[in-house]
């Protein structure tokens, strides 16, 4: 029995949450396995892919949510994703939870070089993949920043404080994990209640809303200065017929 199952009934995994995890294949890992992730593996599929223990996944998810919710200022939590599939998920996560985020290539010195323009001093770091986000994890270890990571079955756990075992290679799996993490943080803060389903759709964590894209395009067009169009080459025509009549 896990710590969450033996503790409060409120934090236990519901059947609907388990169905969401299975539908998005959050429990399907890779064919490789690291020694550090061995304790999170339940079995293997017929194709050879490792199966992650869903109960341990949920236990670590709740632990990570409690750590994030305990930070007084949400901006002190930085969410990073060098993996392209995770940029949309961390954007929506930061939008709902209020954290800072860093998508795309992590610029070296973001946590260690104080003269850098985008220098940050977060209290907690959340990464999508310990392999692709290795630079952020290494810099966090130099300045004593706790690290929460979504870890697949072959992930290295060096300098990772809280490893959430899950499938971090699929866009839908990443979106579901950040959706569940955001929902749990908001519940712990008291922003939303547990008795009412969260209105935010998980699809928006990996697909872009067409209405949102249209609104951003219209706002960008309104903010851009109108280009001045001049006809001809800009010369000034004048009539010199009476120039010698003076």
From Swiss-Prot:
GO cellular component, one term: cytosolic small ribosomal subunit
Compartments reported by the entry: Cytoplasm
Primary subcellular site in the record, as a coarse category: cytoplasm
Main function: Required for the assembly and/or stability of the 40S ribosomal subunit. Required for the processing of the 20S rRNA-precursor to mature 18S rRNA in a late step of the maturation of 40S ribosomal subunits.
Assembly: Component of the small ribosomal subunit. Mature ribosomes consist of a small (40S) and a large (60S) subunit. The 40S subunit contains about 33 different proteins and 1 molecule of RNA (18S). The 60S subunit contains about 49 different proteins and 3 molecules of RNA (25S, 5.8S and 5S). Interacts with ribosomal protein S21.
One BP term from GO: translation
Database matches in InterPro entries: Ribosomal_uS2, Ribosomal_uS2_CS, Ribosomal_uS2_euk, Ribosomal_uS2_euk/arc, Ribosomal_uS2_flav_dom_sf
Organism: Leishmania braziliensis
Stretches of the chain forming a coiled coil according to its record: none
Keywords linked to the UniProt accession: Cytoplasm, Ribonucleoprotein, Ribosomal protein
Lineage: Eukaryota, Discoba, Euglenozoa, Kinetoplastea, Metakinetoplastina
GO MF terms, alphabetically ordered: structural constituent of ribosome
SUPFAM superfamilies: Ribosomal protein S2
Domain of life: Eukaryota
Entry's family note: Belongs to the universal ribosomal protein uS2 family.
Protein name: Small ribosomal subunit protein uS2
Classification via Pfam families: Ribosomal_S2 (PF00318)
């Amino acid at each position: 029995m896990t710590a969450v199952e033996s503790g409060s009934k409120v934090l236990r995994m519901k059947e609907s949450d388990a169905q969401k995890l299975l539908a998005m294949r959050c429990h399907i890992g890779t064919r490789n396995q690291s020694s550090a992730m061995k304790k999170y593996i339940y079995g293997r599929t017929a194709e050879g892919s490792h199966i992650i223990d869903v109960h341990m996944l949920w236990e670590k998810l709740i632990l990570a949510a409690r750590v994030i919710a305990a930070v007084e200022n949400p901006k002190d939590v930085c969410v990073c994703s060098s993996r392209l599939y995770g940029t949309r998920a961390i954007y929506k996560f930061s939008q709902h939870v209020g954290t800072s985020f860093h998508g795309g290539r992590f610029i070296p010195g973001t946590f260690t070089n104080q003269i850098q323009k985008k220098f940050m001093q977060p209290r907690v770091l959340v990464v999508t993949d310990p392999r692709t986000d290795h630079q952020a994890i290494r810099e966090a270890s130099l300045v004593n920043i706790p690290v929460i990571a979504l870890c697949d079955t072959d992930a290295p756990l060096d300098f990772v404080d809280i490893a959430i075992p899950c499938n971090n290679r699929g866009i839908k799996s990443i979106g579901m994990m950040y959706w569940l993490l955001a929902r749990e943080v908001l519940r712990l803060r008291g922003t939303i209640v547990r008795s009412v389903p969260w209105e935010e759709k998980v699809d928006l964590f990996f697909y872009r809303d067409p209405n949102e894209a249209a609104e951003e395009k219209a706002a960008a067009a309104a903010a851009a200065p109108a280009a001045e169009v001049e006809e001809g080459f800009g010369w000034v025509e004048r009539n010199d017929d009476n120039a010698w009549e003076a």
